[in-house]
């Protein structure tokens, strides 16, 4: 019997689709999602959502109904989980990072190592930048015992996309629980300030502004400058991440856009990082949204803390509870939110 998910629940966006498809593919359970993105100005499935569905279907030989642009209803019934080498093209500047969110849990439980080359947007609005996924997401997954890497080949910005990244994953038998309520002491802050098809001073000014903002808090940052001229269109951005002596990693990011000074871009990224550091939370809000799935799949009790209980986070926990016999608990304490769950110890 299919799990039935109301796509308009909570934040009512693409996150519901991504989590539902990932868990359906992983567990081999059919899912029917209705009212997909019903509250959005452009409701229904968009190209990047369709790409995630199609790749998940490719990896599982799934039977799919309703996978077309604008569709508000989708039926997904997976068969056999596959592995190997695959290439996909979103066909727009749709976010590669959001595709990775869908695929990562599936790839970790595939029967053999898998490599997927994804073409699309690496640094686009309303999605984590690719550098966040490379240097925060994958490092947090390591704490769960997962081996997943992301290699950046070329950057792609809105509206033309054309970015490319290679995702590689090693199969895991079981994920292990993570207990980390406090960030710990900062060991190092690193970052990348990039500019594509733009003057080098854009990346330099972004990095300088970020460093200056961090220095006000007594923090030093090693921010690399990356200037490229191989993009289909111009774009820039900054991602900064902090590593603690407890092994935690949190990030802050900002995207350049027409009319937005480079200094503002750098300052925003630093301020986001500082805001989380001040709470001493073990993960940032972006990562909390994603981490709860791995907590639920892991063996044993996991506990993390984050600086903000977002609607994305609440929605994701609800969707996970529809597929797995888990119950999340959240508690606000000392300016941060602690999330706890007893994982199912899933294995294939």
Swiss-Prot record:
Transmembrane segments: none annotated. This is RNA 3'-terminal phosphate cyclase. It comes from the Archaea. Belongs to the RNA 3'-terminal cyclase family. Type 1 subfamily. Signal peptide: none annotated. It is an enzyme of class 6 (ligase). One of its GO terms (biological process) is RNA processing. The active site is at 312 (tele-amp-histidine intermediate). It is found in: Cytoplasm. The gene is rtcA. GO terms for molecular function: ATP binding; RNA-3'-phosphate cyclase activity. Catalyzes the conversion of 3'-phosphate to a 2',3'-cyclic phosphodiester at the end of RNA. The mechanism of action of the enzyme occurs in 3 steps: (A) adenylation of the enzyme by ATP; (B) transfer of adenylate to an RNA-N3'P to produce RNA-N3'PP5'A; (C) and attack of the adjacent 2'-hydroxyl on the 3'-phosphorus in the diester linkage to produce the cyclic end product. The biological role of this enzyme is unknown but it is likely to function in some aspects of cellular RNA processing. Its main location: cytoplasm.
């Amino acid at each position: 019997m299919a799990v039935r998910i109301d796509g308009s629940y909570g934040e009512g966006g693409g996150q519901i689709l991504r989590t539902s498809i990932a868990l359906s593919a992983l567990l081999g359970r059919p899912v029917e999602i209705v009212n997909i993105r019903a509250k959005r100005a452009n409701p229904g499935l968009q190209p990047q959502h369709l790409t995630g569905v199609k790749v998940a279907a490719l990896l599982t030989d799934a039977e799919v109904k309703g996978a077309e642009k604008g569709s508000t209803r989708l039926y997904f019934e997976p068969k056999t989980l596959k592995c190997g080498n695959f290439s996909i093209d979103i066909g727009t500047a749709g976010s590669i990072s959001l595709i990775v969110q869908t695929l990562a849990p599936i790839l970790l439980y595939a029967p053999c190592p898998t490599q997927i080359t994804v073409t699309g947007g690496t640094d686009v609005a309303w999605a984590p930048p690719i550098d966040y996924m490379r240097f925060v997401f994958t490092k947090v997954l390591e704490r769960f015992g997962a081996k997943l890497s992301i290699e950046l080949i070329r950057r792609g910005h809105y509206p033309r996309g054309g970015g490319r990244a290679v995702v590689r994953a090693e199969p895991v038998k079981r994920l292990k629980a993570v207990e980390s309520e406090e960030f710990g002491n900062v060991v190092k802050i690193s970052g990348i300030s990039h500019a594509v098809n733009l003057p080098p001073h854009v990346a330099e000014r972004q990095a300088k502004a970020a460093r200056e903002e961090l220095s006000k808090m007594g923090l030093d940052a090693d921010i690399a400058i990356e200037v490229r001229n191989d993009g289909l269109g111009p774009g820039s951005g900054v991602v900064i991440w902090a590593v603690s002596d407890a092994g935690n990693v949190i990030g802050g990011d900002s995207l350049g856009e027409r009319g937005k000074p480079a200094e503002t871009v750098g300052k925003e990224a630093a301020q986001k990082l500082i805001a989380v550091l001040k709470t001493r939370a073990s993960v940032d809000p972006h990562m909390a949204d994603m981490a709860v799935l791995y907590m639920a799949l892991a063996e044993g009790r996991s506990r993390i803390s984050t600086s903000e209980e977002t609607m994305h986070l609440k929605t994701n926990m609800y969707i996970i509870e529809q597929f797995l016999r888990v119950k999340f608990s959240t508690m606000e304490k000392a300016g941060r939110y602690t999330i706890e769950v007893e994982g199912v110890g899933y294995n294939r």
